[in-house]
Amino acid sequence: MNKKYLLLFVCGLLLSFTNAMAAVGNGVIKIKTNASKGQKIKMEMFIFGGWDEDGDALDNSPVYGDNFSVDGASNVTAAGNKVVMTADGPEITIHGDVDYLSIVGQGVTYIDVSKATELYELRVNENPITSIDLSNAPRLKVFWASNCKELATVSLENTPKLTGISLQGTQITALDLRNNPNLTSLNVGENQNLSSIDVTKLPALEELWVNGNGMEKLDVSKNTKLERLECSKNNLADLDVANNEKIEFLSCWGNKISGNSMDKLIASLVKETEGTEREFCVYNKLYDKEKNALTVAQAKAVKERGWTPKQATGTMDFFTWQAFDGDDATGINTATISHAADNVWYDLSGRRVAKPTQRGIYIHGGKKVVIR
């Protein structure tokens, strides 16, 4: 082959490569996993296909070798939006304009989406990843990394289009949301190291989960579009929802709200006049750290505002909510009283007393007893 034909051959190869890359797209996603060589990796994805007449993104199913390719893995197959591949090593690189990626429980330890310019939804739940930097994902709208038990840091610096975040059950200690004004759904529950969070810069927020975090304060005064608030299993001694007129579901059981603080919370509930069902899940006797207390009079006040006060029934592993008429002795969790000593009496403060002779309500044999 002379030099002229060799040059033409090389040019042809380069042109073919360039055309192939153009078809695949310019986006790049780099992933590291703890998968051993030969282990299957499963994920779901869609490829950006342009815009429709309404300005919404078009999703195309992935076609290997056509609109996406992979380095670091073999035996790649795609069916619908599901993709399966065999890892050749710990590092996998996906080429293509991926706009939706869900890789759940696949041993992901690292992911780089800084060059995934079309990515709008990322789900990496249940992976041993320790940190995620999304500061170069300006198109991202939805991000889930729930039950990533080792995840400690998340950077959201340049993600102004985010509307949904789920970071339930991680190790994060802080989350800066100042640059995410479009958030409508935020789930940061079951994060024992996240003792506080500022949601005052989230005017569009409609759903908020902060349950099980040990929080002592929660300010939702700026979240005027809030419809659902789950703040159970914290250390809240008070709560004010006066500015949340759209709220329809409030779950605040497992806190320390009682007496005057409960009166103030009830007074802050929007008064329902048009028949909208509004639930006030306030008490869970199955929870051994329950310190909320709702009296009969307070339950009546809740109903007068058009809400339904509710308590949990079932077991802590699986419980449902039922209407609650209040209990003037909700300060005692009878499930924690020993049944072994039938001659032992307690007052409603949980103090052991002699067999009572005065009128009142006492705890005896694990049951509430009224002495008249």
What do these predicted ranges mean?
Residues K3-Y5, I361-R372:
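C-terminal tail/sorting-segment detector
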Residues L101, L122-V124, F143-A145, V154, ...:
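Conserved hydrophobic beta-strand positions in leucine-rich repeat
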Residues Q106, N127, C148, T170, ...:
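Consensus "Asn ladder" position of solenoid repeat domains
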Residues L265, W345, I361-H364:
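Short hydrophobic/aromatic-rich beta-strand motifs
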